[in-house]
């Protein structure tokens, strides 16, 4: 049988099906140099030479096993390692650099140190709808004071009723904190359920308030508990003050009246 005689042009065309020479790799010590050919946006053939530093490191067994997985899809015939045509090692991050003048215009006109929200019930740094005292006696008192204050503006009109606690420049009834205690040095992970578990065995309580950070929602480190009876509040101070809880030493004292 006679050997088939082929043209050298056919052999070249078979090697370079897409008109580009195959990529080449050259290892020089700890560096690997990869030479590739491709077409740019203008349709011109260009040569791209990339250099990689070879590093050996110890990885977990799961990572080593994952690197031996069989490639599929467009990367089915690729060599080990990422292919720049089908794989992105990292996400592209676009950055816009601003000048000093542009930065001044973007400054928030509001003072960042001042709270944006203020509760009308307890004057805390949160919205009234999220107040822990909503629906309690404190909420009822605040609504009564607001309604009575509006009525004071019309005291000159005959027949208008003014509550006794607002007459003669009165500032309203003070909240009864005689059976309230302040628990401080709490951990950031403290929750209302943890606080309930901490004080429920001492005695019945009417309400609790766990102070939280406005942005993160973590505990600020203190809380208030209003016991039903003053003797239970005194017992809570005696039991919990200096008590170790969540790797911290609690400090419990009588709640001081607000000015």
From Swiss-Prot:
Keywords tagged on the record: Cytoplasm, Initiation factor, Protein biosynthesis, RNA-binding
Keyword match Mitochondrion: no
This protein's record includes keyword Cell membrane: no
An example Gene Ontology molecular-function term: RNA binding
Ranges of residues in domain RRM: 179-257
Location in the cell: Cytoplasm
Annotated GO biological process: formation of cytoplasmic translation initiation complex
Gene Ontology cellular-component annotations: eukaryotic 43S preinitiation complex; eukaryotic 48S preinitiation complex; eukaryotic translation initiation factor 3 complex
InterPro entries: eIF3_g, eIF3g_N, eIF3G_RRM, Nucleotide-bd_a/b_plait_sf, RBD_domain_sf, RRM_dom
Subunit note: Component of the eukaryotic translation initiation factor 3 (eIF-3) complex. The eIF-3 complex interacts with pix.
Family: Belongs to the eIF-3 subunit G family.
Function: RNA-binding component of the eukaryotic translation initiation factor 3 (eIF-3) complex, which is involved in protein synthesis of a specialized repertoire of mRNAs and, together with other initiation factors, stimulates binding of mRNA and methionyl-tRNAi to the 40S ribosome. The eIF-3 complex specifically targets and initiates translation of a subset of mRNAs involved in cell proliferation. This subunit can bind 18S rRNA.
PANTHER family reported in the protein's UniProt record: EUKARYOTIC TRANSLATION INITIATION FACTOR 3 SUBUNIT G
The protein's name in its UniProt record: Eukaryotic translation initiation factor 3 subunit G-2
Phylogenetic classification of the source organism: Eukaryota, Metazoa, Ecdysozoa, Arthropoda, Hexapoda
GN (gene name): eIF3g2
């Amino acid at each position: 049988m006679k050997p088939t005689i082929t043209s050298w042009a056919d052999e070249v065309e078979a090697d370079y099906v897409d008109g580009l020479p195959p990529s080449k790799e050259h290892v020089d010590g700890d560096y690997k140099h990869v030479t590739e050919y491709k077409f740019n946006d203008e349709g011109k053939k260009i040569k791209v030479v990339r250099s990689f530093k070879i590093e050996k490191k110890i990885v977990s067994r799961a990572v080593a096993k994952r690197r031996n997985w069989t490639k599929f899809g467009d990367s089915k015939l690729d060599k080990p390692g990422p292919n720049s045509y089908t794989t992105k090692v990292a996400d592209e991050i676009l950055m816009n650099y601003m000048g000093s003048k542009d930065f001044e215009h973007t400054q928030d006109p509001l003072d960042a140190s001042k709270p944006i929200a203020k509760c009308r019930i307890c004057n805390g740094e949160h919205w009234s709808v999220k107040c822990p005292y909503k629906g309690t006696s404190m909420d009822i008192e605040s609504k009564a004071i607001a309604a009575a204050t509006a009525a004071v503006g019309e005291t000159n009109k005959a027949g208008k009723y003014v509550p006794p606690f607002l007459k003669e420049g009165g500032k309203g009834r003070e909240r009864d904190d005689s059976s309230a205690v302040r628990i401080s040095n709490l951990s950031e992970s403290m929750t209302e359920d943890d606080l309930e578990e901490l004080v429920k065995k001492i005695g019945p309580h009417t309400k609790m308030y766990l102070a939280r950070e406005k942005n993160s929602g973590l505990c600020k480190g203190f809380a208030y508990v209003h016991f039903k009876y003053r003797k239970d509040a005194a017992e809570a101070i005696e039991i919990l003050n200096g008590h170790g809880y969540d790797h911290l030493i609690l400090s419990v004292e009588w709640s001081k009246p607000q000015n």
